[in-house]
Curated annotation (Swiss-Prot):
The keyword Cell membrane does not apply. This is Large ribosomal subunit protein bL31B. NCBIfam families: L31 (TIGR00105), PRK01678.1 (NF002462). Pfam families: Ribosomal_L31. Keywords: Ribonucleoprotein, Ribosomal protein. Part of the 50S ribosomal subunit. The lineage of its organism: Bacteria, Pseudomonadati, Bacteroidota, Bacteroidia, Bacteroidales. PANTHER family: 50S RIBOSOMAL PROTEIN L31, CHLOROPLASTIC, LARGE RIBOSOMAL SUBUNIT PROTEIN BL31C. It comes from Porphyromonas gingivalis (strain ATCC BAA-308 / W83). The gene is rpmE2. The keyword Secreted does not apply.
Length: 85
């Protein structure tokens, strides 16, 4: 590895998904203001709003958005602009 280009503070960090309280330990250079103790070891704690354990794409619990009503409303208001008068 090339010397002098890699971060010095690459260490184990805990990421906590705040939507479902899941935690996972990985290596990161992110700075943390809080710490958490897991199995007797203190780690820096990074809180995230969403992760792979709660994101609909990864969980398969996709939320369907009903846009058909919006399209119908638009078409009734403005009609088909491509029609020749």
């Amino acid at each position: 590895m090339k010397k002098g280009i890699h971060p010095e503070n690459y260490r184990p960090v805990v990421f906590k998904d705040m939507s479902n309280e899941d935690i996972f330990i990985t290596r990161s250079t992110m700075e943390a203001k809080e710490t958490i103790e897991i199995d007797g070891v203190t780690y820096p704690l990074i809180k995230v709003e969403i992760s792979n354990t709660s994101h609909p794409f990864f969980t398969g619990k996709a939320k369907l958005v009903d846009t058909a009503g919006r399209v119908d409303k638009f078409m009734s208001r403005y009609g088909d602009r491509n029609k020749k008068k």
